[in-house]
Amino acid sequence: MLFEQIAANKRKTIFIILGFFIFVLMVGAAIGIIVWNNYLNGLILAAVIGAFYILIMVMSSSSVVMAMNHAKEVTSKDQAPVLWDTVESMAMVAGIPMPKVYIVEDASPNAFATGISPEKGAVAVTRGLLNKLERYELEGVIAHEISHIRNYDIRLSTIAIALVAVIAILSDLAMRMIFWGSLTGGRNNRKSDNNNSGGAQAIIYIVALIFVILAPIIATAIQFALSRNREYLADASAVELTRNPDGLIQALQKISGDSKKMEEVSASSESIYFASPLKSKKNKPGLFDSHPPISSRIERLENM
């Protein structure tokens, strides 16, 4: 059951990522139709901007994420021996280099990982998590975060965030070009061969325009769907490492029962946390939820 869940989650992720890239190209094609009456120009624009933005995002240092979330590096085992040993042992089991270790001075129990590859990985936990969890529960959480690093989830989420940003940029660019085109009479200079073709072009233009307007919303929903799927995969992978689903289950129960919200959370970092720092109590995932409901995660773990 465990390995079936892991395989199913990986397949689902591949479909989501492929769909995401196709969606970006569709947005580019729609913009090409709207602005130049030529979808190919839009495809090229989307591909160029997308490749450039993804490159910039992937090259960004994980230290930026740590700074945004007020995480301080643990530079020696003496500073946090239990945490250090747990990260070291889980990394060894996962077969990756030991990630850098950070602590966020916040009373709410939570954790996150960053780093686009296992060689550049880092794990951060809140002070509340260290104070609230037993050793075996902490192992479950750390195994979950180590799994994100081993599965290249941070790289995937970085690409997803970049693609959402690219779609927002393309959509905004299209609106500006339409505005300036309307002022200069750009589209009025395009003549149709006959009334029928002119009517068809108008319909295509309107459909493309609606698609471009809705694209940022749809892209955000796709990004969060990917995020929720990777959380399930990291849970399953954590059990593969610890061979103890109870530790992760009890950690999730304790975090769910804790009412404290994190004091300072970067909005752009919400999706990387172990559990939503906004403390959502939903039992069903919404389109714009970065995490699946904790009750759903526990149910899947209990069925392993």
Swiss-Prot record:
Domain of life: Bacteria
Cofactor: Zn(2+)
Membrane-related topology note: Multi-pass membrane protein
BP GO annotations: proteolysis
A Gene Ontology molecular function term of the record: zinc ion binding
GO cellular component: plasma membrane
Subcellular location: Cell membrane
Cofactor note: Binds 1 zinc ion per subunit.
Transmembrane segments: 14-34, 39-59, 159-179, 202-222
Keywords: Cell membrane, Hydrolase, Membrane, Metal-binding, Metalloprotease, Protease, Transmembrane, Transmembrane helix, Zinc
Active site residues according to the UniProt entry: 145
Ligand binding (Zn(2+)): 144, 148, 231
EC number: 3.4.24.-
Record keyword Protease present: yes
Secreted keyword on record: no
Family affiliation: Belongs to the peptidase M48B family.
Protein name per the record: Protease HtpX homolog
Species in which this protein is naturally found: Listeria monocytogenes serotype 4b (strain CLIP80459)
Encoding gene per record: htpX
